Design a protein with these regions (language model features):
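Short loop/turn segments at beta-alpha junctions that line or gate ligand-sensing/allosteric surfaces
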Residues: 154
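Charged, low-complexity intrinsically disordered terminal segments
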Residues: 2-148, 157-168, 174, 178-476
C-alpha cells in the first residue's frame, strides 16, 4: 500500500509539473514576427495608401458602417440583425451568459432558428464551462434542429495542456449582407440598458450593398470557416431532444416577445443604408486560429500602419508588454506623437491589468509615449488605434501579451476620415477625463478629471498582488 501511494504521489507530481510547464512556462516561448506576414501587411498598407492618394479613381466601395459606442444600442443592433436574418446567422463570442441581455440574444437566435434560419454559434470553452454548462436555456438552443454550436478549445482532460489558448473574437454575421465586430462580450456587462456594473465598449456594424461581395465580409467569412473547422473546436451535443425543453422554449418565446415590445423595430427595421455611411476600405487582420502560440500578427499590422502617421492614439483597457512590445511602442513614438489611453488603476475593472501597470508604469513611459490614466464613469473596454485623421483600427485586441501571443484576435483596419473623426471625438473626451503623464514625468489633469484615491483595503490588495503577478504577467 505504501508503494502504491508513493507511486501515485510521483505520478500526480509529474502530471502537475507537466501541466505547469505546458500552461505557464511554454507560453513564455514567444513566437517572433515573420517576414512573410510583414510583406502581407506592407501590401495592405500600400493598398490603403493608394485609396488615400486619389479618391476620384477609386470605384465606390459597397461597405457602409455604423460605430456603436452605447451598450443599449449594441443590443438593439444585434437584435435587428438577427431579427432580419433570412438564411444564416453566425455568432462567435468569447463570453456568453444566460443573464438578461445574454438570454435575450439566445431568445432571438431561437426565434430565428424556429422560422428556418440556420444558426452557427461558436463559443470559447472557458466561459462556456463557467456560465453555460448549467443553463437550460442554452441547452434548449443547442437542441434546436437548425442550430449548431461548437466550442473552441473546450475544457476537457485532453485539452488540459492548452488551457491558456482562448478564442477572444466577438462578431456576428447575417446572411451575405452584414456583420458586426468589436470588443463586446454577450452579457449584461456590455449589452443592454443597465447603468451599473458595466463596461463601455465599441462595435463596428458593416452593411454591404453588393450582396456578399465586400472584401472585409469575405475575409471574415474565410476566417470563420478556418476557425470553425479547427482541430481543437468540438461540436456541442444536446443532452436531450427538443421535446424535453418545451418549458425553456416557452420561456425563450416570452423573452423574445418582451424584447419586441420594448424594441419595436427589431424585425422590420429597414434603414440599413440610410443609417450607415460609406467608407473607403476595410481590411480584416487576425492573429491566427490555432489553439496554440501565435505570431504577433495583429501588433505587426498596427505597427506598420502607425509608422505611416504623424499622430497615433491607442485606446486599450490596460497595457501588459514584453520587451518586443515595448520596442514596438518606442519605434512608433520615435516616428509619431503617440498617446496611450488606458483605465486608471482607481477605475479599472481588471485587477491584473491594473497591478501590472503599477509594476511597469515607468517602462511604458520610457518608450516615449504619453499615457492617459482614464477616470471614466465606467471602465472602458474599447480597443482602438487612430492614425492621423483617416485610419481607424478597431476590434478585440488588447495591448497585452495574452492578446499578442495566446488568444485569437480580430481587428478591422478602416480607411474613413468620418469614422476617425467620430472615434477621435470620444477619445478627446476620454483624455479630458484623464491624468496626462508625459515620458519626462510631467503630469497634468484634464478639465473633466475626477480624482479618486484608493481605499486602504484596495491599496493592500494591490501591494500583495504586485508581488504575486510578476511571474505570470504573460498570462494575464
Amino acid at each position: 500500500m505504501k508503494k502504491f501511494i508513493k507511486r501515485l504521489t510521483i505520478i500526480i507530481g509529474l502530471l502537475l509539473a507537466a501541466l505547469f510547464i505546458a500552461n505557464v512556462l511554454f507560453p513564455c516561448l514567444y513566437k517572433h514576427p515573420t517576414s512573410e506576414y510583414a510583406r502581407e501587411v506592407s501590401q495592405m498598407e500600400e493598398n490603403i495608401r493608394e485609396v488615400q492618394k486619389d479618391h476620384a479613381e477609386v470605384t465606390e466601395n459597397s461597405e457602409r458602417i455604423y460605430c456603436i459606442d452605447d451598450n443599449e444600442e449594441a443590443l438593439i443592433w444585434r437584435l435587428r440583425m438577427i431579427g432580419n436574418a433570412k438564411e444564416r446567422i453566425v455568432l462567435a463570442t468569447f463570453d456568453l451568459r444566460a443573464d438578461d441581455s445574454g438570454s435575450g440574444i439566445l431568445a432571438a437566435l431561437y426565434h430565428a432558428a424556429d422560422r428556418g434560419v440556420q444558426v452557427q454559434l461558436l463559443i470559447d470553452g472557458i466561459y462556456q464551462k463557467l456560465f453555460l454548462d448549467g443553463s437550460k436555456l442554452f441547452q434548449a438552443l443547442v437542441a434546436q434542429e437548425n442550430v449548431e454550436v461548437r466550442i473552441y478549445n473546450p475544457i476537457t482532460l485532453m485539452n488540459m495542456f492548452r488551457l491558456n489558448y482562448r478564442m477572444h473574437d466577438k462578431y456576428l454575421i447575417v446572411d451575405d449582407r452584414m456583420y458586426l465586430l468589436g470588443g463586446r462580450n454577450t452579457n449584461d456587462i456590455f449589452l443592454g440598458d443597465k447603468k451599473t456594473g458595466i463596461n463601455a465598449d465599441r462595435d463596428i456594424l458593416m452593411y454591404d450593398t453588393s450582396c456578399g461581395e465586400s472584401d472585409s465580409l469575405l475575409q471574415l467569412e474565410d476566417y470563420f470557416q478556418r476557425i470553425w473547422n479547427e482541430d481543437h473546436v468540438s461540436k456541442k451535443k444536446s443532452h436531450h431532444g427538443q421535446e424535453y425543453y418545451a418549458e425553456q422554449y416557452d420561456e425563450l418565446a416570452e423573452k423574445y416577445d418582451a424584447l419586441k415590445k420594448k424594441y419595436t423595430d427589431i424585425e422590420n427595421y429597414d434603414s440599413w443604408e440610410a443609417d450607415t455611411f460609406a467608407v473607403d476600405k476595410i481590411t480584416l487582420v487576425d492573429n491566427g486560429t490555432q489553439a496554440g502560440r501565435k505570431n504577433p500578427q495583429v501588433l505587426q499590422a498596427i505597427e506598420t500602419m502607425a509608422l505611416q502617421g504623424e499622430e497615433v492614439i491607442i485606446q486599450t483597457p490596460y497595457v501588459i508588454c514584453n520587451t518586443y512590445m515595448y520596442g514596438v511602442l518606442e519605434t512608433i513614438s520615435q516616428k509619431a506623437d503617440t498617446k496611450v489611453i488606458l483605465n486608471a488603476v482607481e477605475k479599472g475593472s481588471n485587477p491584473w491589468g491594473c497591478t501590472d501597470y503599477l509594476n511597469q508604469k515607468q517602462k511604458i513611459l520610457d518608450t516615449g509615449v504619453t499615457a492617459y490614466e482614464l477616470m471614466n464613469e465606467h471602465a472602458v473596454h474599447s480597443k482602438a488605434v487612430l492614425v492621423d485623421d483617416d485610419i481607424s483600427i478597431v476590434g478585440s485586441y488588447n495591448l497585452d501579451m495574452r492578446s499578442t501571443y495566446l488568444d485569437t484576435e480580430l481587428m478591422l483596419v478602416i480607411e474613413s476620415p468620418e469614422l476617425n473623426e467620430q472615434i477621435r471625438a470620444t477619445e478627446n473626451i476620454y483624455m479630458e477625463k484623464s491624468k496626462e503623464i508625459r515620458s519626462d514625468g510631467q503630469e497634468k489633469e484634464g478639465s473633466l478629471y475626477e480624482k479618486k484615491i484608493l481605499n486602504q483595503k484596495k491599496q493592500m490588495f494591490y501591494s500583495v498582488l504586485r508581488i504575486f503577478v510578476r511571474p505570470f504577467r504573460h498570462l494575464l
